Amino acid sequence: MNFSEVFKLSSLLCKFSPDGKYLASCVQYRLVVRDVNTLQILQLYTCLDQIQHIEWSADSLFILCAMYKRGLVQVWSLEQPEWHCKIDEGSAGLVASCWSPDGRHILNTTEFHLRITVWSLCTKSVSYIKYPKACLQGITFTRDGRYMALAERRDCKDYVSIFVCSDWQLLRHFDTDTQDLTGIEWAPNGCVLAVWDTCLEYKILLYSLDGRLLSTYSAYEWSLGIKSVAWSPSSQFLAVGSYDGKVRILNHVTWKMITEFGHPAAINDPKIVVYKEAEKSPQLGLGCLSFPPPRAGAGPLPSSESKYEIASVPVSLQTLKPVTDRANPKIGIGMLAFSPDSYFLATRNDNIPNAVWVWDIQKLRLFAVLEQLSPVRAFQWDPQQPRLAICTGGSRLYLWSPAGCMSVQVPGEGDFAVLSLCWHLSGDSMALLSKDHFCLCFLETEAVVGTACRQLGGHT
């Protein structure tokens, strides 16, 4: 495993292009585009203010930079660096901006969610969509880019509108049986739309493309409900994470629950492999001691080593006592993601923040648990194979695969605190992001990594 040099970064804004050829990063008001293979700077663009959001067009030819405080969006072209577009929403303000799937239209959401403005880069025409709902996930596109679903709120009721992306004509408009709609998401095959309600009302609804209600699912009443939702890439399963610390798996045939995964603090099953991160301070030999002691700032002292150990059951996981009299308590399933082959599901229970649970979806059972020394900040699956990358806000990267686990120290002066990460679409590298910097991590082939994992006490 190799690492690149460290580059400057602002606001964790660093994204690979969809075609995998470029890497865009932001340093305050500057946008830097690099070649992924050489990391040489290809283009350097200067925006009018500090960049708060970036997004590549689907064809990787354009990149959007949003400056919400100024109500501005600037669009840059990689093929024609001298060309650029500026969109000023003026007094209407700006709270969100995204590309349409064709990469030639930009959707801007104005302040207070009064409307969505659709700007065409080709014809310079402008269209308006009224009544967008202010919710966590209110816009979703089908994978083939043909349709857009939009959550709306009008006359104190929730609605969903489905638009044809080629001409922005309204295809379907229907009300949803929700108290306060929180999110919508298309299945990867584009046939079913999942709609879920506020956490105060446990309800998830499944609609067809023509607006027919296919099914409604509710696990319980009178308690905090849904916290997270994820489709499997195969569209066969819908995972619903709840505030009660369980994940419920719905199937695509009957839309009924086929199983539920609990997240207890104690693991007693000897068939479950529990990997515990262990830290060991390096032993300083007599030759390593210096007299007098080194001055502050004279160089970093040897850092502690980290590795995984297989814990013997029963295992008690570290829990966090939630503050229940405040909003958004740290309980329930806050993170969940399917592997690209739909074989595995990774989850995190927010009141057991140091643990990542990996579930075998084929056998509908718990496969492994990874307990870190620090709370898990983020995890993401390799796009090409069942390999999970994890970061905890420290200077280490953690990898899990069915072959086992490994912990890798990120090199560099001082501590490189990995706050987030994103895979390259090839699965051969990933970007590691800290508060003010980023670097690239290059991985060997799966055979080499698998061998390394087994040497570190892996389990198959």
From Swiss-Prot:
Residue ranges that the Swiss-Prot or TrEMBL entry lists as coiled coil: none
GO terms (BP aspect): cell projection organization; mitotic spindle assembly; positive regulation of non-motile cilium assembly
Chain positions of WD repeats: 46-86, 89-129, 176-210, 221-260, 328-369, 371-410
Localisation per UniProt entry: Cytoplasm; Cytoplasm, Cytoskeleton, Microtubule organizing center, Centrosome; Cytoplasm, Cytoskeleton, Microtubule organizing center, Centrosome, Centriole; Cytoplasm, Cytoskeleton, Microtubule organizing center, Centrosome, Centriolar satellite
Keyword Repeat among record annotations: yes
Entry's Gene Ontology cellular component terms: centriolar satellite; centriole; centrosome; ciliary basal body; cytoplasm; microtubule organizing center; MWP complex
Main location: cytoplasm
Superkingdom of origin organism: Eukaryota
A family per Pfam: WD40
Tissue expression profile of the protein: Ubiquitous. Predominant expression in heart, brain, liver, thymus, prostate, and testis, and barely detectable expression in lung.
Keyword Repeat: yes
Modification type Phosphoserine: residues: 281
Disulphide bridges: none
SMART domains tied to this protein: WD40
UniProt keyword list: Cilium biogenesis/degradation, Cytoplasm, Cytoskeleton, Phosphoprotein, Repeat, WD repeat
Subunit record text: Interacts with SSX2IP.
Task performed by this protein: The SSX2IP:WRAP73 complex is proposed to act as regulator of spindle anchoring at the mitotic centrosome. Required for the centrosomal localization of SSX2IP and normal mitotic bipolar spindle morphology. Required for the targeting of centriole satellite proteins to centrosomes such as of PCM1, SSX2IP, CEP290 and PIBF1/CEP90. Required for ciliogenesis and involved in the removal of the CEP97:CCP110 complex from the mother centriole.
Descriptive protein name: WD repeat-containing protein WRAP73
Organism expressing this protein natively: Homo sapiens
This protein's encoding gene: WRAP73
